[in-house]
Structure formats: C-alpha cells, structure tokens
C-alpha cells in the first residue's frame, strides 16, 4: 500500500470517528467527543463508588448528611426543571443520585462521579461554613457530571 492511500484511510477513519463520536454538551451546546458510552462509564463509576464507601470512614453526622441530601435533592429538581422548561433532553435522567459524607478533616474536597455519585469530605465543611457555601461546592461538582466532562475526558484518553 502506498503512503498516499494509507494516509487517506487514516483520514477517513479519523473523520468517521469525529463525526460519530461528537455530541453536544448540555446547556452550552459546545461540541464534545464521546466515544465511550455513558452507560459504561456510569456502571464503572457505581462500582468505584461502592469501593470508596467500603474503604473510607463514613461520617456519623446524620444531621449534616441529611442537609447534604436535601441540598442535592433541590439541585436535582432544579436541573430537571431547567431542562424541562428549555425543551432540552435532561442528561441526568439515567442518574442514580447518591450522597455520602466521608469523615476526613484533612481532605478539603468534594467530587461527583458520572451517574450522580457524590462525596463530600468533612474537611471542606470548615471552608464552606454554611449550607450556601456547601451548595456552591456541590453545584460545581454536579455541573461536571451534568456536562458529561468525565465521558469527554475518558473519550479523549482513548485517542
């Protein structure tokens, strides 16, 4: 096979991948590369989330966990309402929302895995100070999941 023919095959393959693997990000309508099916990533995230729950010490602060769940539920409802009112497909319809509070004062962080699996470390509570601050952090993390950043990042990693 000559070089020109080989390069044309590579070009066609890459073009096909880009056309079939591109989609639009919710809210911003930015083009995203999505080669990996979201359902696969959500399933893997759920398994990892369960392992985190087994490995990490969960906080005994039921009041704070309930506040986290309440904030999360209000965000879930707001997300659904936004997509309903704008006529766009809700990217969270297949999410199985879950919230945990991990007892670790040294880690000042929170995260949201694909599929709506959210973890808050007790260390960040000193920074957020109140429910409004906590809602800001949670909203930021949930926005990554809504925007499908993990799917996009994993897809780019396959190239």
Which stretches of residues belong to each language-model region?
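A Zn2+-metalloprotease active-site environment signal
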Residues: 2-159
